[in-house]
Amino acid sequence: MASRLLRGAGALAAQALRARGPSGAAAVRSMASGGGVPTDEEQATGLEREIMLAAKKGLDPYNVLAPKGASGTREDPNLVPSISNKRIVGCICEEDNTSVVWFWLHKGEAQRCPRCGAHYKLVPQQLAH
């Protein structure tokens, strides 16, 4: 039994020695011709690349990310972007609620959800293209 373990360890040691170059330093093996596996930033193209570069700058040009939630008070309403003067908004009201309360939000002052009282305000938005 011990001889099998020693033979296995010897084979591993020989394999490790073969992996070293002539100078004794470990030989570096790359998986791709360019020096390794490319990162997501190096491999992305087109729209995906634009979104990744904008995200590094803290921008969200195509509204891919979830909107930042506010406290929903009159002083700090939830901001709803829109390209028109009105937009329909859905409020869940409570975390475990199974229905959505839909209401129209118009440009101007902040408006309240009819059920829970959370405030929403319509803000103008420019299209990315």
From Swiss-Prot:
It comes from the Eukaryota. Keywords: Acetylation, Membrane, Metal-binding, Mitochondrion, Mitochondrion inner membrane, Transit peptide, Zinc. It is a peripheral membrane protein. GO terms for biological process: mitochondrial electron transport, cytochrome c to oxygen. CDD domains: Cyt_c_Oxidase_Vb (cd00924). The modification N6-acetyllysine is found at K68, K86, K121. InterPro entries: Cyt_c_oxidase_su5b, Cyt_c_oxidase_su5b_sf. GO terms for molecular function: metal ion binding. Component of the cytochrome c oxidase (complex IV, CIV), a multisubunit enzyme composed of 14 subunits. The complex is composed of a catalytic core of 3 subunits MT-CO1, MT-CO2 and MT-CO3, encoded in the mitochondrial DNA, and 11 supernumerary subunits COX4I, COX5A, COX5B, COX6A, COX6B, COX6C, COX7A, COX7B, COX7C, COX8 and NDUFA4, which are encoded in the nuclear genome. Belongs to the cytochrome c oxidase subunit 5B family. Component of the cytochrome c oxidase, the last enzyme in the mitochondrial electron transport chain which drives oxidative phosphorylation. The respiratory chain contains 3 multisubunit complexes succinate dehydrogenase (complex II, CII), ubiquinol-cytochrome c oxidoreductase (cytochrome b-c1 complex, complex III, CIII) and cytochrome c oxidase (complex IV, CIV), that cooperate to transfer electrons derived from NADH and succinate to molecular oxygen, creating an electrochemical gradient over the inner membrane that drives transmembrane transport and the ATP synthase. This is Cytochrome c oxidase subunit 5B, mitochondrial. It comes from Pongo abelii.
